[in-house]
A protein has these predicted regions:
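Serine-dependent acyl-ester chemistry module
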Residues: 47-122, 126, 137, 146-147, ...
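Short helix-loop-beta-strand segments that form the rim/entrance of peptidase-like active sites
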Residues: 224-240
Length: 519
């Protein structure tokens, strides 16, 4: 009896061992297959093999292929385009900051809350709202909020970035809270100080090692060294996302003017680009309110897409089910643009109060910026603004998904033709304004390659696109800088300046915030 029982036990153990071995072999095979599929997908999508989490999804890196077709500038070596530009020195991210960031991103994924992880590392203007708990976005802050008191008591700009910090998205800020490496407030001898202002298309994605102004600074100093010019170019980035021209004017007045720049470059043309002003009554965008919330599988796939290129492909493929066509413009209902009577589209009168896409507001703010800069003998330059849109544009529905969604959902029901028409008109107005006031005009939109692989969506660039915009802006700046250097206008004598920036004397305050139950 015992021998029989022992034999049965032995057989059972053998079967279990075989079952376990087969199971482990199956899991190992599955793991190897998934790893191979992940590696192949990363190779196909030009994603670094060992990057975790994944960088932002981009198209193919086609930037270098365009360099030879761009204008040649005397003294510029095209090989500089491929320089490895070291990122600014990073500091360790405090554990509490990382917890805040991770918790907020999870909350956003689960509930759609407006206060994202990166918003925790902004310093919010106390004049924005008397009570943050009544603010549709700030009320979702995780029990605390960084704040500052504006010097003029007004709500613009709505926020600054934390100074001298590295946030969990890896963006580095200087002593002013501007994107970039360390900077001294006082000007140095034989230095040309250039400040870029704008919104998200200038500050760029916080995950990227550099924004395009940082590339401009690198290329200018490379050029100066190659030419034997005893000048250092200090290129700074005072931009921040989600602001319009009035907010930019406030930043220039409060933050940029005290730094006594030689040149301020304005690049913005998206946040106030609203065609509704000349469209009258248009069909409304289909509501998403009735859509069912994402299920557990969709949430799992979304989380996995941060870490896996294969999961990102699956998520994107699922999203394509809602997309009509094969990358062409989606069907849209008819509407009529009501062009202002007598407005010459090819030679616009910039004094008219009925210019479309909020241009009267923008030009008024540019007037204020010019006036404020003139007080410290600083010059304003205006750049044209590039949109990735044209009539008949066909995109890759996988690689260029976010361009498609912005043009067809974000700007519904407006056609590609009308979006391109108004974007070109806006740039003609910018050029006319620059001519009228004797300002340099940098025609980035006409010079930048029209390549969707350089764009994340219709206005924001991929990282190769940031490098390309930096290179194009550099090429357009060189003739202007040569003129200023030849005339003796630059570099200027070092002005008398206080030791610290007056707008940033008081450090940010971290205040508690208890809004009770989520609303």
């Amino acid at each position: 009896m015992n021998d029989k029982w022992k034999m049965q036990q032995s057989v059972a153990k053998a079967r279990f061992s075989k079952f376990l071995g087969n199971g482990l072999l199956l899991l190992a095979s599955l793991g190897i297959s998934l790893a191979a599929a992940e590696a192949f997908t990363r190779w196909q999508d030009d994603v670094p093999l060992f990057d975790f989490p994944l960088p932002l999804p981009v198209g193919q890196d086609t930037a270098a292929s365009h360099v030879a077709s761009l204008p040649s500038v005397a003294g510029v070596n095209r090989d500089w385009f491929s320089d490895k530009v070291p990122p600014p020195p990073r500091q360790p991210v405090p554990e509490q900051w990382q917890r805040w960031y991770d918790d907020l991103e999870r909350k956003h994924a689960a509930t759609g809350s407006l206060f994202r992880g990166g918003d925790m590392f902004k310093v919010w203007n106390t004049a924005l709202t008397p009570n943050p708990c009544d603010h549709v976005m700030l009320r979702d802050a995780p029990g605390a909020l960084f704040v500052f008191d504006p010097p003029d008591g007004k709500p613009l700009p709505p926020f600054r970035f934390l100074p001298s910090a590295t946030n969990p998205e890896t963006m580095v800020t200087n002593e002013f809270g501007w994107r970039g490496g360390p900077v001294t407030f006082a000007r140095s001898p034989r230095t040309v100080r250039i400040v870029f202002v704008g919104s998200s298309t200038v500050v760029s994605s916080h995950h990227m090692p550099h924004s395009f102004p940082e590339f401009v600074g690198h290329f200018l100093n490379r050029w100066a060294k190659a030419r034997g010019i005893d000048v250092r170019f200090e290129v700074l980035n005072a931009a921040r996302e989600s602001i319009g021209s009035t907010g930019i004017a406030a930043i220039v007045r409060q933050e940029v003017v005290p730094t006594r720049p030689d040149l301020v470059i304005y690049y913005e043309g998206g946040n106030q680009f609203a065609l509704d002003s000349i469209a009258g009554s248009v069909p409304q965008r289909p509501s998403t309110a009735d859509r069912a919330p994402p299920g557990p599988l969709a949430m799992l796939l979304k989380d996995a897409a941060r870490w896996s290129a294969l999961a990102r492909r699956l998520e994107a493929s699922a999203g394509l089910l809602d997309q009509p066509g094969n990358g062409a413009e989606w069907p849209k209902p008819a509407y009529t643009l009501k062009w202002p009577a007598g407005l010459d589209e090819s030679a616009p009168d910039i004094t008219r109060a009925d210019l479309p896409v909020n241009l009267p507001v923008i030009l008024g703010d540019l007037d204020q910026i010019r006036t404020d800069l003139a007080k410290v003998d600083s010059e304003l330059a205006i750049s044209s603004f590039i949109w990735m849109v044209r009539d008949g544009l066909v995109l890759d529905p996988m690689r260029h998904r976010y361009i498609l969604e912005q043009l067809n959902v974000g700007y519904f029901p407006f056609s590609y033709r009308d979006l391109a028409r108004l974007a070109a008109f806006q740039n003609r107005v910018f050029a006319a304004y620059a001519r009228a006031h004797g300002l340099p005009f940098l025609d980035v939109a006409a010079t930048m390659p029209f390549d969707p692989n350089l764009f994340f969506d219709a206005v924001h660039k991929t990282y190769p696109g940031e490098r390309m915009q930096g290179w194009v802006t550099f090429l357009l700046l060189v003739p202007l800088i040569e003129q200023r250097l030849a005339s003796g206008a630059w570099p200027k004598p070092v002005p008398t300046m206080p030791p610290t920036h007056p707008a940033f004397v008081a450090p940010p305050r971290l205040v508690p915030l208890d809004c009770g139950k989520p609303r």
